[in-house]
């Protein structure tokens, strides 16, 4: 859901950035100084405090940001915002992105236009609610791993480059058996990421849907399928596999799953509250990021 909001304003701002990304320390420092000039209280997440001089500012562990801040500003690319979402969503802390990455589907504001933040802090912004996925890996009656994903839950080959055989169930109804290099279960947010390179459809962020995208399937008739986001997806790894595939959430963690194990994916109970400037337009973003502005050459 996308809505223009005139309030509340933001007064306690937490800053986060990923170390090792070019330009992030400089932008964090400039952002800190700008927020101080606006008489906002600035809180530094612990890693951000290592990158800039924040000797006079409060430093807070990532998992405690909500106790001190009412907005989290992330400096970096889409990967940095994905990482921040894993921290902010369970705390229900709104997130705004400053783009220092390559694409910037999720990080709207260029580093040379930090003055746009002033209007946002004063309560003039668009708030977009994006859902996440929750993935659970089970072997027998044991929960091996559990995690959330803003983009996707992905089944990947193991250490050997072999196809994986698995069964797909939706709401306990059998859908199909597949042999493929893997499977991407994507949100609308993730539909312009890994799933897009796998041939998946672009889903508008306001759709309450997710897509299942097979990776290099053995059967040419295997195609992506879009399902209701309220569905529960179960992937059963065939006992016939002689290698253990991996399950990944947003590419951040990777867990091995034995043949016979199950991967359950469903909608996570907390969404991401993503903050945009008032002139944000999703289709403008698609045109710019996917080079749709280029006209086809005349023959």
Curated annotation (Swiss-Prot):
Similarity-based family: Belongs to the NAD kinase family.
Protein's name according to its UniProt entry: NAD kinase
Necessary cofactors: a divalent metal cation
Primary role: Involved in the regulation of the intracellular balance of NAD and NADP, and is a key enzyme in the biosynthesis of NADP. Catalyzes specifically the phosphorylation on 2'-hydroxyl of the adenosine moiety of NAD to yield NADP.
A biological process from GO: NAD metabolic process
EC number: 2.7.1.23
GO MF annotation terms: ATP binding; metal ion binding; NAD binding; NAD+ kinase activity
Location of the active site: 78
Annotated binding of NAD(+), by residue: 78-79, 151-152, 162, 179, 181, 192-197, 252
First-level EC class: transferase
A GO CC term attached to the entry: cytoplasm
Subcellular location: Cytoplasm
SUPFAM superfamilies: NAD kinase/diacylglycerol kinase-like
One Pfam family here: NAD_kinase
Gene: nadK
Reactions mediated catalytically: NAD(+) + ATP = ADP + NADP(+) + H(+)
Keyword annotations from UniProtKB, A to Z: ATP-binding, Cytoplasm, Kinase, NAD, NADP, Nucleotide-binding, Transferase
PANTHER family membership: NAD KINASE
Broad class of where this protein is predominantly found: cytoplasm
Family matches, as Gene3D superfamilies: Probable inorganic polyphosphate/atp-NAD kinase, domain 1 (3.40.50.10330), Probable inorganic polyphosphate/atp-NAD kinase, domain 2 (2.60.200.30)
Keyword Zinc applies: no
